[in-house]
Amino acid sequence: MDLSGCGTALITPFRADESIDEPALRALVDWQIASGIDWLVACGTTAETPTLTHDEWLRVIRIIAEQAAGRVPVWAGCTHNATRQAVENARQAAQIPGVTAILVANPYYNKPTQQGLYEHFLAVARAVELPVVLYNIPSRTGCNLEPETVLRLVGAAPNIAAIKESSSNLPQIGELLTRAPESFRVYSGDDNMALGTIALGGAGLVSVASNEIPREMAEMVRAAVQNDWALARQLHRKYFPLLQANFLETSPGPVKAVLAMMGRIEERYRLPMTPVSSATRARLERLAGELGLLVETPVPQR
């Protein structure tokens, strides 16, 4: 999978009745692409995917892939903590026109061994022909996908093409980049670790902040990939306070709050996600104002 740059892990906008806000989602896709984002991720962590029904999960992927219309690649998040269901999810997502890769995180809650992780990901990879992107996010899943296991998987399934590394463990990322084949892509899954990952040989970033600042994050990552480190550092320093503030509370709470301030979505969540606190909201509003993000954008008509 020859893909470098910045992809966005899209949020899922909801209405007051908690239904999916399809016009807002389609508008977000168009804005992301017009802003220079290199690919989109449907139904990842930032999308509140565990709160979606299976039919809603399929619908969100279809909407994003349909609206992207081949302009950028689309990765479909197919994570499940039951391997059988993860396999079925991957098979269903792979049939959606416009889906170009399958993203699968470690099974959450189960806390499998490395052998369990190996067999889980291998089963998913063998069920589809599309490239499979591993997704290591121990803080959410309760288990870490170790480099040795990744290397075993790469050797066993040729369509395991990449990993989204959200462990925030730079030595682990460095080990993986040192030992993996050059064709295997490593993407940072952490905005704050993007430049470090790219400096070690990573291919780019799957970003949360690019929901709010797609053009700026795409420019920062592109600069790093092209070895323009002066520009990359300049942009990172400018937007670092926002990258930090996005995790003052559980994501995507802060990101959705900022997008609502920008007029791009209604600020709606599904429990157990709740609106951010008044203190967090005040800090986000101040940062968004300082960064010039509060230009009014009408929420798409329904």
Swiss-Prot record:
GO molecular function: 4-hydroxy-tetrahydrodipicolinate synthase activity
Catalysed reactions listed for this entry: L-aspartate 4-semialdehyde + pyruvate = (2S,4S)-4-hydroxy-2,3,4,5-tetrahydrodipicolinate + H2O + H(+)
Major site of localization recorded for this protein: cytoplasm
One matching Pfam family: DHDPS
PROSITE patterns referenced in this protein's UniProt entry, alphabetically: DHDPS_2
Transmembrane segments: none
Residues annotated to bind pyruvate: 46, 206
Pathway note: Amino-acid biosynthesis; L-lysine biosynthesis via DAP pathway; (S)-tetrahydrodipicolinate from L-aspartate: step 3/4
EC number: 4.3.3.7
Highest taxon of the lineage: Bacteria
Any one GO biological process: lysine biosynthetic process via diaminopimelate
The protein's assembly and partners: Homotetramer; dimer of dimers.
Entry's family note: Belongs to the DapA family.
PANTHER family per the UniProt record, alphabetical: 4-HYDROXY-2-OXOGLUTARATE ALDOLASE, MITOCHONDRIAL, DIHYDRODIPICOLINATE SYNTHASE
Role this protein plays: Catalyzes the condensation of (S)-aspartate-beta-semialdehyde [(S)-ASA] and pyruvate to 4-hydroxy-tetrahydrodipicolinate (HTPA).
Protein name listed in UniProt: 4-hydroxy-tetrahydrodipicolinate synthase
Organism: Acidobacterium capsulatum (strain ATCC 51196 / DSM 11244 / BCRC 80197 / JCM 7670 / NBRC 15755 / NCIMB 13165 / 161)
